[in-house]
Amino acid sequence: MSDPLAAIARFPGVPEAVDEARQAVDRLYRHRVLRRASPAVSTESSLRGARASAAIEGVDVPLDVLRRDEAHDPLVQGALRASAEMGRLGATWRKAPRQVLARLHVVAAAGLTPQEELGRPRAFDEASDPLSLGPAPAAADTAARMEGLLGLLEQPTKAPAIVLAAVVHAELAVLRPFGTADGIVARSAERLTLVEYGLDPKSLVAVEVGHLELAYGDALRAYLSGTPEGVGAWVQHCAAAVSLGVRETTAICEAMQRG
């Protein structure tokens, strides 16, 4: 059986970027604060990740506003709900990814999408485009590519978790299978993949913060080119986002250590 993800993992620059990110995660997991406060660190990381994910979509809310539960924008609320839901979806992600994506959309797009469209693949060709990626693929083409993505998730691969997570993230972000809140769903699915495929089993890494700090839209446009160079650049971007997410979580640990 072919392993297209393993081929992507060998693109120039990808092995080195992935290895650097993995080493960063390994260093984070040795932080002494995590011996006693791992759940608290994960909770804070998830909050910062949700804030960053909403900011990428154009709604930037300060962390202290989120902590006081004073952010009422539906997109921000959707990002927070998706972040909270991930902990309940992990065991299902490998077995029923379609079900998980639908559930993520239900919680992420509530208040943005008519009730009857929540969790359902779009039947129309139009989709929101907050990153100015251009028109989304037609609904029929999107459905076909989604089947291919779900097939990738179901077959074994020798590719590192970062590569799988990067491809899942990019396909959801560029296909926009639901038409609204697809970016929130895409970044949630990436984080879920990093957790469930072993890179970050405690969900500590605020990878969304890394995406916000980097040239996220440009990296997705590189992926859209479909060339080995473009796809490789996207995976390297995702690896760099993991490393920056580790830096963010390390700062959380240091703050807790200081008390």
Annotate each PLM feature.
Residues 1-259:
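FIC/Doc superfamily catalytic core
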